[in-house]
Amino acid sequence: MAADVEGDVYVLVEHPFEYTGKDGRRIAIQPNERYRLLRRSTEHWWHVRREPGGRPFYLPAQYVRELPALGDPAPAPQPSVPQQRPAVPEPLAYDYRFVSTPVGADGSSAEPRGRASSLCGPARQRTGGQRNSLAPGGPACLYVRPAAPVRPAQSLDDLARGGTAPPAGLLGSAGHFKASSVAGSWVCPRPLAPSDSENVYEAIPDLRCPPRAESPKQVDDPPEPVYANVERQPRATSPRSAAAPPRLSPVWETHTDTGTGRPYYYNPDTGVTTWESPFETPEGTTSPATSRASVGSGESLETEWGQYWDEESRRVFFYNPLTGETAWEDETEELEEDHQEQLEMQPSLSPRSPGQQRPPTPETDYPELLASYPEEDYSPVGSFSDPGPASPLVAPPGWSCQITPDKQMLYTNQFTQEQWVRLEDQHGKPYFYNPEDSSVQWELPQVPIPAPRSVRKSSQDSDTPAQASPPEEKIKTLDKAGVLHRTKTVDKGKRLRKKHWSTSWTVLEGGVLTFFKDSKTSAAGGLRQPSKLSTPEYTVELKGASLSWAPKDKSSKKNVLELRSRDGSEYLIQHDSEAIISTWHKAIAEGISELSADLLQGEEGEPSSADFGSSERLGSWREEDVRQNAASPSLSPGGLESDLSRVRHKLRKFLQRRPTLQSLRDKGYIKDQVFGCALAQLCERERSPVPRFVQQCIRTVEARGLDIDGLYRISGNLATIQKLRYKVDHDERLDLDDGRWEDVHVITGALKLFFRELPEPLFPFSHFHQFIAAIKLQDPAQRSRCVRDLVRTLPAPNQDTLRLLIQHLCRVIEHGEQNRMTVQNVAIVFGPTLLRPEMEEASMPMTMVFQNQVVELILHQCADIFPPH
């Protein structure tokens, strides 16, 4: 799915690639070339442009690497630590710089044997294509638990004064990054096994040791970067007590439920909460896990991670000041994503009594601490805020709940015996699934409970007002979903020329039938995760719609449904399976019947005061009068006339209060369109002799090259042309260099569509017969002179626009050997577009021949008819 790019983002080519575009351009990229990223169009192709002023093009996303974006992020706020916490040493702030390992005269490494292990070693394999290097493009480096705490070291400036300047590292002599702790943002990545790697941190005094002669080793590779810990604010670190209780992995936090007062346990790594103690504590020893946001406990300091900013790669990473472990931010996100997938594959459906519900997570129990918790620290599983039943086993009225042998909660309707299974989505939010028709919805269908109906009493019978029942809340349910073939034949009363059948993911939900654009990704996860559906292409309201089987003259396909909406649009829906289309017919028909009943009730009810500016009833006065006449035959015959006059008076006041069209235009509610607007009116509005859209199209076509084969003859994608038309009509800022309009045939098609949509063609209707009579003249000189005089009698906007268009088409004809567009071909394309009668005549084929001849003559005599200024 396409994603816009914010800011200046560049990509670096890593592999050569070459291809030929649709417009005939040859695109070639070479390694180490840099381009500006404009748009991530798809998963495999990105839209880029060479800086500065280059033409945009597409290149494969797998062949390039995205460079880090520029700009320094704002430092995170530092929350204060409560005073009552015991004072503990704060984590040291380090200045990380890239230095090289000293190499002895014999080429051996100066690294001591006791701390041997290169910083860059074989990368520990992880799933998801994780990046292990600290700097983009660097070697795969490991950051693991050291054998001993990291020791403070001397600064590099002291080393320089000592006379042993470190050599340049892999990233250059000036490559370094600063690490500043961000209090309140702590994460705990999964600890590594001791066998994964060895200590990778090296202190500055070790670098100054002389090389060992007994460990000769030929160094063929470039010097490897070594991270040196430089102490900025040295503080005495209190040693850990030997009697401290051992830390458990994974880490659990203890919280108190504000509703029940019971303590519960929360795992910040997985987001799981439980009432039961996840670990057994020895007698006389209590070691509750502390909150992730607290850094005052010396016991939990080992598992606390600080969030730091790498100025070199401009990325956030996490560092444990005691264990020496470091991790990228995306590593913790991948751990959370893996856990979310595990929760989705194995949902927790075990029965729970009201006292055994899942306890709340910290964001629910402590809402005031949400500002200090980063979003990626814990999962919101079981912490949704949507209203629901107090317990899964507490069934709504009219339903009974039981546990199946598969440990699933089955709800049964006590009246219709309808059964629904309770499941949970990836966020722990419950939803209900009907195994009979595969329908899914967030809540159980409401069971109508009989209630005493209130009788409407007139003011003549009683002064007591009738009790108004509260409006029944409508539940938006997912009635049906699947893949269907569909096409739109009529758009709001306007019949479309062609039927374009396409396959789309179709959803019937809450009385609305929605056709989505992309069916590949939606069909797989649409029922399970409705939020992943793509952008809807068509949305049809079933209220007031009609459904029937399409006759043969509408479509030759089998199993075709015809759906007509209230706004005058018509759709054809088809599926190869008769059983599937029958179920769709039943579901849509039931939805239409239910909504039609509601529509009739709404028409019989009283209209709101917002519709007519008054709370008086203006509705079904005829039925009221009929009932009153039947009840009291002695009613005055003038009562009906008075009601009619009252309604007429109310309607007149309502129409008089309507704003004028000009006032709506002045306020910006109505914007005049470009397509379909009169040429003179459009030029006057834009204050230009030629419409701006025509000028933009001509400039863009000539800039991209007039040697493209079939220019103005090959049709562009109709859907893209309609999108461009919508963009022109609703947005004043039009950029034809955007990647969406890369195909030049889309621009030429939009230009031809603009001239076809004119209310009056470029050659006005009043001049049509005169041009036809002039082209029929036998004398060539007289014919040319007559056509030239007629062109000069055209209105000024028509004449200026025709001049610009004809001169552009002449330049297209000059490249006829490459684009194969001769004078005859161009005349055939633009003849019926520029010159047409007001009413279609019987001799239409013969008239079309004369139309083409008129345009062909103007193209030949362009220099004479339109002399240069």
Swiss-Prot record:
UniProtKB keywords: Cytoplasm, Endocytosis, GTPase activation, Membrane, Phosphoprotein, Repeat, SH3 domain
Main location: cytoplasm
Top-level taxon in the UniProt lineage: Eukaryota
Compositional bias (Polar residues): 283-294, 345-356
Residue positions where Phosphothreonine is found in the record: T464
Residues modified as Phosphoserine: S155, S215, S249, S350, S459, S462, S469, S632, S636
Domain Rho-GAP: 677-866
Tissue expression profile of the protein: Widely expressed. Highly expressed in kidney, lung, small intestine and thymus.
Site (Arginine finger): R713
Domain PH: 477-593
Domain WW: 246-280, 299-333, 414-447
Matching CDD domains: PH_ARHGAP9-like, RhoGAP_ARHGAP27_15_12_9, SH3_ARHGAP27, WW
Domain SH3 positions: 6-69
Biased composition (Low complexity): 235-250
Compartments reported by the entry: Cytoplasm; Membrane
Pfam family, one: WW
Biased composition (Basic and acidic residues): 209-220
Biological process terms in GO annotation: protein heterooligomerization; receptor-mediated endocytosis; Rho protein signal transduction
Region (Disordered): 104-134, 208-300, 331-401, 449-477, 623-642
Any one Gene Ontology cellular component term annotated for this protein: membrane
Record SUPFAM superfamilies: GTPase activation domain, GAP, PH domain-like, Quinoprotein alcohol dehydrogenase-like, SH3-domain, WW domain
Oligomeric and partner information: Interacts with SH3KBP1/CIN85.
Protein name: Rho GTPase-activating protein 27
Originating species: Mus musculus (Mouse)
